[in-house]
């Protein structure tokens, strides 16, 4: 290397560990910060046909109580505590219960910041999360933090029930517990997490907007 030449190579990426919770749920850590995507661990047993032409699959000898769509679900704290001892940021792709119903409990327990749409913020506030632990986004934001950055990407849910989609709207702000029916989609987001020299593209649903992810 000549005297006038400079090294331009980037530092080697650090280690990042990913844990899959099942469904859309992930835990990502660089050994310092812990990031969660759609951490739904309670796995409630629901009854109804909101998301398809048939009831939820029956499991023999399932001890979980059945929750109907006009009833409020309960967080399985034992399971959540076992799998989520720490969290710093919780990114929620959309506001269906099977993506975000555990998030308020996790945020209150760990002090994590919840990132998501207006509907997601209402779920957090309904669940007793302090407003300073919420970050409302619409898609298009790109935040630089101390050791990582987060780009929020407008996205789409997937069509349900014979390609028809009937779940638009906003989750209400209310004092009493939400029913399953009230966990509407509320808009869908994807996230690009940049941490420890890595870029991780996170989707919580099965659709996307092609132009929004071009060049990533």
Predicted regions and their residues:
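Beta-strand-turn-beta hairpins that frame and shape the catalytic cleft
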Residues: 10-16, 29-35, 142-151, 194-200
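Short beta-strand scaffold segments in enzyme catalytic cores
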Residues: 24-29, 189-193
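Active-site HxH/HxHxD metal-binding segment of metal-dependent hydrolases
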Residues: 76-144, 148-164
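Short polar catalytic/cofactor-binding loops
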Residues: 22-26, 41-42
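Short beta->alpha connector loops
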Residues: 22-24, 95-98, 205-209
């Amino acid at each position: 290397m000549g005297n006038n030449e400079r090294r331009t190579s980037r530092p080697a990426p650090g280690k990042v560990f990913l844990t899959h919770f099942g469904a859309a749920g992930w835990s990502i850590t660089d050994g310092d910060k812990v990031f969660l995507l759609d951490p739904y661990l309670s796995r409630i047993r629901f009854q109804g046909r909101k998301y398809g032409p048939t009831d939820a699959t029956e499991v023999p000898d399932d001890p979980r109580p059945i929750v109907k769509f006009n009833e409020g679900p309960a967080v399985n704290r034992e399971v959540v505590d076992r799998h989520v001892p720490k969290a710093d940021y919780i990114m929620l792709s959309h506001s269906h219960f099977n993506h975000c119903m555990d998030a308020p409990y996790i945020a209150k327990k760990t002090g994590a910041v919840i990132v998501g749409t207006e509907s997601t913020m209402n779920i957090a506030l309904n669940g007793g999360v302090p407003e300073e632990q919420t970050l409302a986004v619409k898609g298009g934001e790109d935040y630089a933090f101390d050791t990582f950055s987060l780009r929020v990407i407008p996205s789409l849910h997937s069509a349900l029930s014979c390609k028809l989609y009937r779940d638009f709207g906003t989750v209400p702000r209310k004092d009493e517990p939400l029913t399953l029916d009230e966990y509407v989609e509320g808009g869908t987001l994807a996230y690009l997490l940049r941490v420890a020299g890595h870029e991780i593209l996170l989707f919580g649903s099965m659709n996307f907007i092609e132009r929004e992810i071009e060049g990533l």
